[in-house]
From Swiss-Prot:
ATP binds at Q89, G107, E108, G109, K110, T111, D502. Part of the Sec protein translocase complex. Interacts with the SecYEG preprotein conducting channel. Has a central role in coupling the hydrolysis of ATP to the transfer of proteins into and across the cell membrane, serving both as a receptor for the preprotein-SecB complex and as an ATP-driven molecular motor driving the stepwise translocation of polypeptide chains across the membrane. Keywords: ATP-binding, Cell inner membrane, Cell membrane, Cytoplasm, Membrane, Metal-binding, Nucleotide-binding, Protein transport, Translocase, Translocation, Transport, Zinc. Its main location: membrane. Belongs to the SecA family. CDD domains: DEXDc_SecA (cd17928), SF2_C_secA (cd18803). It catalyses: ATP + H2O + cellular proteinSide 1 = ADP + phosphate + cellular proteinSide 2. Monomer and homodimer. Part of the essential Sec protein translocation apparatus which comprises SecA, SecYEG and auxiliary proteins SecDF-YajC and YidC. This is Protein translocase subunit SecA. It comes from Bartonella bacilliformis (strain ATCC 35685 / KC583 / Herrer 020/F12,63).
């Protein structure tokens, strides 16, 4: 019986078809304007930008400008690059403008498509961020697409890793800014650690288009960006613990590859305890005693480093450093470090220099960073499989954009073998057959180790003319990938290495021009050579087409269908022919970890002989089912982690907003008085609570705490002996005494100086306590899961206790600020010595990776100038009024004023 949904779909079409139909109608409206825009001069076309901006000022909406704005960009692209965006690119541009994700096949022109909504939204003048996965793509796209924006009178900036603060600020001030997700996140964190608004570089989060959105918002969703500072050096202990692991046997530990965890068995725990005891590091006989918490952490990391992390698969050793390999792309991630001591454990394992651990100063995940944008959209070749996650987490709808030309790629059924050895024999055989007829081949592997194993097999078989593209040769990545479509080219690549670079049959013209003609200046010779390259590429393309187009051969299935689809999508761009096939074995990680027992028994019943493969659609469906299970599990993990991170994110917003208020404030006296009064009221409530008899009051403790906190001795014990005195009277006396004491201390300083002191005290105290709070939250997060054993919801427990920790932090903040305010001294201090603080930007995957990002200097500049009168008392600075910065200081020190009393910082006790 045919379901009603199928009947309805046949009658009315699917929701996607209806949406695309509506967008096509709008694309036709844009195309109808084309003839008019073709008649405009370059100046008139450029003038459209000012016209659109004026219309926005006059009350028109950005949506009403869309048809004309898109037509403007289309015409500009034709004039600048002789490239005309197709109607399907107009459709994709509208999806991006409407807060959606445009799923567009490889080679269909995502980069050009993005110029349409980028231009439209840049008209508002609030800044548009185009986000890419690496500096190369950010720089390339800013350079190429920037010419279109410049033609239309808009400015384009690019944020690269090595830019200084001023250059970053200038790039963010542009109408359009290209940057990587890492740089955007780190700049946000740095901005919220500055001491002055003028030191910030970003100007808000208005609209962002994320290229390769699945990579950033799905694959790296659990990746916190971390700003950290160094902790104490524990190199000797890492090396000691590292010597324990080789003495263990398989019965001493358990490995869960599915969950990626390692644990000691009871026998293993006893062995470790004995080794620690002999080394003099075990307290109270048990490894799991509360005093050995830090040791357990080190031992567990050492076990994980040795038994779970594989060299040349998860990381490589290069130039004496551990360099992490991205599990999704196979790329090196230089500068990134595993956090929480894991990276140090790997360094000890590989006997390279151990870098000190870092303390988190500020952090944010990509999930929470990109959800700050008022408007967010993305584009990729593969997003449909993750549509539910994009919708639930980010509120983004995935729209599959139709191709400009029909896809001609043939996706063949998988070939499955019993063993890895049989699989590789078949792969080499298939490569030889395709290679001999001149077909370009892209071989996809899942790790550096496997790509090099295959390369070695090919060499033994006499096939040597191939390129290996993996994390070891990252610098050549784009060029090698760009030429993978040349007839006879054989390229072995780890996963999605080279993503973002098109594989064009015959080779990439632009890449060849850049590579071959970089030293030849503009002129007739260069023009002639460019024409020759174009003719050569066309001939090579015809040969590649005749050989069947690009053949994508995958040596293994990934956990995610999306990654497999990305690899397939490298072939068959823009209607070109091509083919793809996956070669698998029952010993592959996916099959082995996620249950191939049933499949193995079926293959045995079928009487599968050695070197024989089974090819059947049922196998593909079974594999897809396994992948869906893994994807669903990973989605649940990400969703659950986000719930926990949202707790910290809410607190982070409060702290960062408070810092911004303080930096923007012209006078903080009222805030300081309020904090001071809150502290006093808390002390009163603690030691002489309302509604209690005076016999229950603890006057001695109150007097002691007032002395510590306010640097003020008050006769509280005598006051409480007075007949009929109430706690309210004591409160008023304390407030009066504290106010008088504070006024006497500050009357000699100008209002500007006091604002500076208040800001310095507040910001430094907030930052210090926030760092401690982050450590407390990390500790809480690491143990909260055990609450489940007591039949309590760990998430609710975490929310409750995190809130209590936050409340305690705010209480401590008030007390610390007041204490420092009441005890600071004004001392002479040269402006040049402004307390530098060493910090690192880090990038942590699954709360485990850090990214070293250079050294930042957090400096508090005192730009206030104290004035000086005609009659000046050297001992009384209040009589000096205005003093020139280069005049001698009135105090009689014979120093210039700017190097004496003209430069002050607060000296804080405690």
């Amino acid at each position: 019986m045919v379901s009603l949904s199928i009947i309805a779909r046949k009658l009315f079409g699917s929701a996607r078809e209806s949406r695309i139909k509506r967008l096509r109608q709008k694309a036709l409206q844009i195309s109808a304007l084309e003839e008019h825009f073709q008649k405009l001069s370059d100046g008139e076309l450029c003038q459209k930008t000012d016209e659109f901006r004026q219309r926005l000022t006059d009350g028109e909406t950005i949506d009403s400008l869309l048809p004309e704005a898109f037509a403007t960009v289309r015409e500009a692209a034709k004039r600048v690059y002789n490239m005309r965006p197709f109607d399907v690119q107009l459709i994709g541009g509208m999806v991006l403008h409407n807060r959606g994700i445009a799923e567009m096949r490889t080679g269909e022109g995502k980069t050009l498509m993005a110029t349409l909504p980028v231009y439209l939204n840049a008209l508002e003048g609030k800044g548009v961020h185009v986000v890419t996965v690496n500096d190369y793509l950010a720089n390339r796209d800013a350079e190429t697409m920037g010419k279109i924006y410049s033609f239309l009178g808009l400015t384009t900036g690019v944020i690269l890793h090595d830019l200084d603060t001023n250059a970053r600020r200038a790039a963010y001030a542009c109408d359009i800014t290209y940057a990587t997700n890492n740089e955007l996140g780190f700049d946000y964190l740095r901005d919220n650690m500055t001491f002055d608004r003028s030191q910030m570089v970003q100007r808000g989060h208005h609209y962002a288009i994320i290229d390769e959105v699945d990579s950033i918002l799905i694959d790296e969703a659990r990746t916190p960006l971390i700003i950290s500072g160094p902790l104490e050096d524990r190199t000797d202990f890492y090396n000691l613990v590292n010597t324990f692991i080789p003495n263990l046997t398989p019965e001493d530990y358990e490995i869960d590859e599915k969950q990626k965890t390692t644990t000691f068995t009871e026998i293993g725990t006893e062995k470790i305890e004995k080794m620690l005891e002999q080394a003099g590091h075990l307290k109270n006989d048990s490894l799991y005693d509360i005093e050995n918490v830090a040791i357990v952490h080190h031992v567990n990391n050492a076990l994980k480093a040795h038994k779970l992390f594989v060299r040349d698969k998860d990381y490589i050793v290069r130039n004496g450093e551990i360099v992490i390999i991205d599990e999704f792309t196979g790329r090196m991630m230089p500068g990134r470090r595993y956090s929480e001591g894991l990276h140090q454990a790997l360094e000890a394992k590989e006997h390279v220099a151990i870098q000190p651990e870092n303390q988190t100063l500020a952090s944010i995940t990509f999930q929470n960073y990109f959800r700050m944008y008022e408007k967010l959209s993305g584009m990729t070749g593969t997003a449909t499989t993750e549509a539910e996650e994009f919708s639930n987490i980010y509120g983004l709808e995935v729209v599959e954009i139709p191709t400009n030309l029909p896809v001609q790629r043939l996706d063949e059924d998988d070939e499955i073998y019993r063993t890895t050895e049989e699989k590789y024999r078949a792969i080499v055989r298939d490569i030889r057959q395709a290679h001999e007829k001149g077909q370009p081949i892209l071989v996809g592997t899942t790790s550096i180790e496997k790509s090099e194993q295959l390369a070695e097999r090919l060499r033994k078989e006499g096939i040597t003319d191939f390129k290996v593209l993996n994390a070891r040769y990252h610098e050549q990545e784009a060029y090698i990938v760009a030429q993978a479509g040349v007839p006879g080219a054989l390229t072995i690549a780890t996963n999605m290495a080279g993503r973002g670079t098109d594989i064009q049959l015959g080779g990439n013209i632009e890449m060849r021009i850049r590579q071959e003609l970089q030293d030849i200046p503009e002129g007739s010779e260069r023009t002639a050579k460019i024409e020759k390259i174009k003719q050569d590429v066309q001939k090579l393309k015809e040969k590649s087409l005749a050989a069947g187009g690009l053949y994508v051969l995958a040596t293994e299935r990934h956990e995610s269908r999306r990654i497999d689809n990305q690899l397939r999508g490298r072939s068959g761009r823009q209607g070109d022919p091509g083919r793809s096939k996956f070669f698998l074995s029952l010993q592959d990680d996916l099959m082995r970890i996620f249950g191939s027992d049933r499949m193995d028994s079926i293959l045995q019943k079928l009487g599968l002989k050695e070197n024989e493969a089974i090819i059947h659609p049922w196998i593909n469906k079974a594999l897809e089912k396994a992948q869906k299970k893994v994807e669903a599990r990973n989605f649940e993990i990400r969703k659950n982690l986000l719930k926990y991170d949202d707790v910290m994110n809410d607190q982070r917003k409060v702290i960062f907003e408070q810092r911004m208020e303080i930096m923007n404030a012209e006078n903080l006296t009222d805030m300081m008085i309020e904090m001071r009064n809150d502290v006093i009221e808390d002390l009163i409530e603690t030691h002489i609570p309302s509604g209690t008899y005076s016999e229950k009051w603890n006057a001695k403790a109150l007097q002691s705490e007032l002395s510590q906190c306010f640097n003020l001795e008050l006769p509280i014990e005598e006051w409480v002996k007075e007949d009929g005195i109430a706690e309210q009277q004591i409160l008023e006396r304390i407030l009066d005494a504290v106010t008088k004491f504070e006024n006497e201390r500050t009357e000699h300083y100008s209002p500007e100086m006091m604002v500076y002191f208040h800001k310095a005290i507040l910001l430094k105290t907030i930052d210090m306590l926030w760092r401690e709070h982050l450590i407390n939250l990390d500790h809480l997060r690491s143990v909260i899961g055990f609450r489940g054993y007591a039949q309590r919801d760990p998430l609710n427990e975490y929310k409750t206790e995190a809130f209590e920790l936050f409340q305690t932090m705010l209480k401590n903040l008030r007390r610390d600020v007041v204490s420092k305010l009441m005890s600071f001294e004004i001392v002479q201090h040269p402006l040049e010595s402004t307390m530098p603080q060493e910090m690192y930007a880090e990038h942590s995957t699954s709360r485990n990776i850090d990214k070293k990002d250079g050294i930042l200097w957090a400096q508090m500049q005192n730009n206030t100038e104290v004035s000086d009168p005609i009659k000046r008392d050297p001992g009384d600075s209040s009589t000096w009024e205005k003093v020139g910065r280069n005049e001698l200081c009135p105090c009689g020190s014979s120093k210039k004023y700017k190097h004496c009393h003209g430069s002050f910082i607060p000296k804080m006790d405690g």
